Amino acid sequence: MAKVNITRDLIRRQIKERGALSFERRYHVTDPFIRRLGLEAELQGHSGCVNCLEWNEKGDLLASGSDDQHTIVWDPLHHKKLLSMHTGHTANIFSVKFLPHAGDRILITGAADSKVHVHDLTVKETIHMFGDHTNRVKRIATAPMWPNTFWSAAEDGLIRQYDLRENSKHSEVLIDLTEYCGQLVEAKCLTVNPQDNNCLAVGASGPFVRLYDIRMIHNHRKSMKQSPSAGVHTFCDRQKPLPDGAAQYYVAGHLPVKLPDYNNRLRVLVATYVTFSPNGTELLVNMGGEQVYLFDLTYKQRPYTFLLPRKCHSSGEVQNGKMSTNGVSNGVSNGLHLHSNGFRLPESRGHVSPQVELPPYLERVKQQANEAFACQQWTQAIQLYSKAVQRAPHNAMLYGNRAAAYMKRKWDGDHYDALRDCLKAISLNPCHLKAHFRLARCLFELKYVAEALECLDDFKGKFPEQAHSSACDALGRDITAALFSKNDGEEKKGPGGGAPVRLRSTSRKDSISEDEMVLRERSYDYQFRYCGHCNTTTDIKEANFFGSNAQYIVSGSDDGSFFIWEKETTNLVRVLQGDESIVNCLQPHPSYCFLATSGIDPVVRLWNPRPESEDLTGRVVEDMEGASQANQRRMNADPLEVMLLNMGYRITGLSSGGAGASDDEDSSEGQVQCRPS
C-alpha cells in the first residue's frame, strides 16, 4: 500500500480547506490502521443469531436484526442500545435497511416469514406490511435517488419493487428469475449502484451474478402497455419480460465448466452477497461454495481462453526457459469460445521490445518469492509475486512465475488464475517457453482436453528441442488417456446419450430459457479473486469494500473468523476471530475506520484501530496461511462432515492445519519445470 505521512497531510489540510475531503478519504482506512484493528466492544441485547447490520448515512446509528425477530438501533460510538422493538415478523430477520432521506426514522425489515415490514422508529410501530413473496425474504435494497422506493429479493425467485407513496399494500414484480431459470431458482441478495441508482445487481442460485437497468425495464413495460397489440399474444409471439440490453451477466470464467463436478459432490454455488464499490465502478460478490470475486464494470473482460501468437522467434533465442525480448499484446480479446472445431491462434503483432529489467527492490521481492517457491510455500510465493506484479505489470516473467505457484498450490480456481497469468505472460513475451507449456497443463486441468492437446502440439512446434522431454511426454500421455476416457464414456451412453449443453429441459421446474442461455454466454469475467475464507454453511455471508477508496476487501467465514485482503494485490493481510462459530455480517462505517460484525453469537462486535500499548493477540489469527488451507479443505469436504464440524465435532484432516503432502503435483516434469524463472 502507498506510504502515508499524516503530519504533512494535517498541515496541508489546515492550509487548504479543499483538502479536507481528500484527507478523510486517504485516512479512512490505512495499512497501519489495519495492523492495529482489534475488538473495541460487544453490543449485547439480542437473544438469537444476528443476521443483518446497517449503518445510517451519518454513521452515528447502527441497526441490527436477529433470529429473535427484534430489531435494535444502537449508538455504536457510546455502546448504547437506543431502541429495541419486535418487528411483527414470525421468523428470523434476514435484512434491515434505513429508508434514505427519512431522518433515520423509517426502518425496513425482511424475514423468513416471507414478509417485508416498514417501521416508524419514533413511535415504535409497524406502518406497512407486505406479504407478496411466497418464500423467505433474504435482502432489502434502497437507493438515495428514490427515497420512497425500495426492493426485495426472496427465495421465490422474485425481485419486487415497493413504492410507499402508493396506497396499495402490494408491490410489483420487477424481475421474475423463474421466467428464465425455472421455478427452482432462488434470489439471495441484491444491491443498487450508489452512483447510478438505475443499476441493480442481483445474486441468486448458481455462479452467475446479474446486473439490471431498472429504467430500461420500466420503459419497456410502459411501451408494452401502450402498444395496440399488448393484449394479443400467441405461443410464438410471447413478449420478452426484459428488453434487450437491460441485463448483463458476470461469472468467474472457470465456474460454469466446474458445475457438473460440484453438483456431483453436492457442492452448491450461490451468490450470498453483492455490493458496489463507493465509486460504483466495481462489483464485489461473495460466492457461496467458492471464493470472493471482484468484477470491473468499466473495463469488462470476457472469460479467458486459449490465445497464442502464431509467430515466434526461433527457439535458439530462448534462454533458460524465456526469451530476452518482450512481446506486445496481440490485441485479441479474451473471450471464452472454446469451439468444438478448435480455436484460432492469432498472429503476434508489433515490434518485440527488449525485456526491461526489474528495479533492484522488485528483483529482491522476486528472489524472495522464488525462495518461498523452492520451500513449497506456495501462498507466500503467490503473495510476493502479486506484490511485484502490482509494481511491474508488464513483466512477463512475474506472471509466468506466479502461474507456476498457482499450479502447485491447487486451491479452487488456482488453475484458472494460472491460465490467465500464462496468457498474460505470452501476450507480453510470445516466446515465453514455460508459459506456453503451463498453458497446456492448465487447459488439461480445467477439462479442456482437446484444446490442451492442440496447445501441446503448438508448443512442440514452437520449441522442437522440448518435444520429447519427459514433461511433454507425461502431459501427452495424460491428455491421450483423458481423450480415450471421454470417447469411451460417450460410446457407452449410446446414440443420443450425450445431450448438448443447450438442450432445454422439458420440465418447467428446471428449464432454462434461450434468452437466459444467450445472457450466460455473454457473461463477463472477474478482475480479482480473494481466497482464504470459507462460505458453505450459511447463505447470508457478506463481503464488503473497506475504505473510502475501496482499498481493502473484508469477508466473513465459516471458521468464525473474518478475513481482510488488499484489493489490488489480492494478498491476505489480516485474519481476526469474530465469532465462536460463523461470521456472517461485516458492515464498515461510512467515514471512520470502524467495522461492525455479527454471526451466530447473539452479539454485535465493533472493531477499530487499537492503541499500540494494547495486546491484540487474543483475537488475531497468526497462522493466516494455515487457516486458509483449512478452509480450502472445509469447502471441499463432504457436506455431512462440514455439518458435524460446525456442530463442534473434530474431523481429522479438516480442522487441523497444514496443506497435506498428498496434494502435491507430480514433480517429475523433465526439462520443462514448473519452478519459477
Swiss-Prot record:
GO terms (BP aspect): cellular response to insulin stimulus; glucose metabolic process; in utero embryonic development; intracellular chemical homeostasis; multicellular organism growth; negative regulation of fatty acid biosynthetic process; negative regulation of transcription by RNA polymerase II; protein ubiquitination
Gene Ontology MF annotations: enzyme inhibitor activity; histone binding; histone deacetylase binding
Modified residues (Phosphoserine): 353, 511
TPR repeat locations: 362-395, 397-432
Pfam families: WD40 (PF00400)
Gene3D superfamilies per the UniProt record, alphabetical: Tetratricopeptide repeat domain, YVTN repeat-like/Quinoprotein amine dehydrogenase
Pathway membership, UniProt: Protein modification; protein ubiquitination
Domain of life of the organism encoding this protein: Eukaryota
Region ranges (Disordered): 487-509, 655-677
WD repeat segments: 45-84, 88-129, 132-172, 182-222, 265-305, 535-575, 578-617
Gene Ontology, cellular component aspect: Cul4-RING E3 ubiquitin ligase complex; cytoplasm; cytosol; nucleoplasm
Key words of the record: Phosphoprotein, Repeat, TPR repeat, Ubl conjugation pathway, WD repeat
SUPFAM superfamilies: TPR-like (SSF48452), WD40 repeat-like (SSF50978)
Keyword Repeat: yes
Role of this protein: May function as a substrate receptor for CUL4-DDB1 E3 ubiquitin-protein ligase complex.
Protein name: WD and tetratricopeptide repeats protein 1
Organism of origin: Homo sapiens
Lineage of producing organism: Eukaryota, Metazoa, Chordata, Craniata, Vertebrata
Gene name for this UniProt entry: WDTC1
